[in-house]
């Protein structure tokens, strides 16, 4: 099986070659994520909400540990989104405990998991309920000209970056996409729910990245065209762009963006040349598109441009760059870093890593 690399799975950079190289995730504290949840919690109800800090632990394993400690089935443990294992992350979980007192969750805690806050609420935590994620990244072993770095950072703060799905979505060496293609060619869906979700997500993400890569290559990823479907940064609804909509000042303000397809049943609702491009993409991947439609996936949209909120940076040491920013839920910090620096594995200073 051939290993798929960064250009196979993502696409070209929008802002030119990387300004240099650095190491990310030398330790978990170098990649910190804080979930941003805009839900007022009532303090009462049959759902126990937990604000959890975890280190070197993925979200699914943390959920299993919390469920075991609470004595509840996994279906009664909820979280808004998956967070990286190789990171220090803080996120919410909820446990459904109707008629039960708060359980002793000490068995779930350890050096890699701490419960920072507990409160009650009337509803469970829904997937995708978080509004955003706040990131603090520490890039070490930095080799780059600071003047070039500062100029690039100012540029992406002003205009954003392509909203690619990150390499994490596709598994090691693109393995999730390889498996998705195999399932599509055989017209089957894995019985295991987690595998099914992982493969369907990889297939949709790849098609989106293909479309975005085309628009980055021609310089239209951040400009609206007649026939585009436009969406606001934090909205899942969209509307068709005519000539007047293409002149909307909110596009220049990075509040409104062109979108690309998350493939599902039926043709995309885009128009004009945009629809032609998206149908041509589907024609180049017929098995994958049929498979996604047959799986009952609804056709959705994702913004092509990723605005970076509150981007700040400094150099705590001569060879360390620290970044702080906020991204909408479902967006990848690594695609921001990719527009700035090449990442190299710990202990190396050559050859960009493939993850």
UniProtKB/Swiss-Prot annotation:
<dbReference type="GO" id="GO:0003723">
    <property type="term" value="F:RNA binding"/>
</dbReference>
<keyword id="KW-0413">Isomerase</keyword>
<dbReference type="InterPro" id="IPR050170">
    <property type="entry name" value="TruD_pseudoU_synthase"/>
</dbReference>
<dbReference type="InterPro" id="IPR020103">
    <property type="entry name" value="PsdUridine_synth_cat_dom_sf"/>
</dbReference>
<keyword id="KW-0819">tRNA processing</keyword>
<feature type="domain" description="TRUD">
    <location>
        <begin position="160"/>
        <end position="306"/>
    </location>
</feature>
<comment type="similarity">
    <text>Belongs to the pseudouridine synthase TruD family.</text>
</comment>
<dbReference type="Pfam" id="PF01142">
    <property type="entry name" value="TruD"/>
</dbReference>
<dbReference type="InterPro" id="IPR042214">
    <property type="entry name" value="TruD_catalytic"/>
</dbReference>
<dbReference type="InterPro" id="IPR011760">
    <property type="entry name" value="PsdUridine_synth_TruD_insert"/>
</dbReference>
<dbReference type="GO" id="GO:0160150">
    <property type="term" value="F:tRNA pseudouridine(13) synthase activity"/>
</dbReference>
<dbReference type="InterPro" id="IPR043165">
    <property type="entry name" value="TruD_insert_sf"/>
</dbReference>
<dbReference type="InterPro" id="IPR001656">
    <property type="entry name" value="PsdUridine_synth_TruD"/>
</dbReference>
<protein>
    <recommendedName>
        <fullName>tRNA pseudouridine synthase D</fullName>
        <ecNumber>5.4.99.27</ecNumber>
    </recommendedName>
</protein>
<dbReference type="GO" id="GO:0005829">
    <property type="term" value="C:cytosol"/>
</dbReference>
<dbReference type="GO" id="GO:0031119">
    <property type="term" value="P:tRNA pseudouridine synthesis"/>
</dbReference>
<feature type="active site" description="Nucleophile">
    <location>
        <position position="84"/>
    </location>
</feature>
<dbReference type="InterPro" id="IPR020119">
    <property type="entry name" value="PsdUridine_synth_TruD_CS"/>
</dbReference>
<comment type="function">
    <text>Responsible for synthesis of pseudouridine from uracil-13 in transfer RNAs.</text>
</comment>
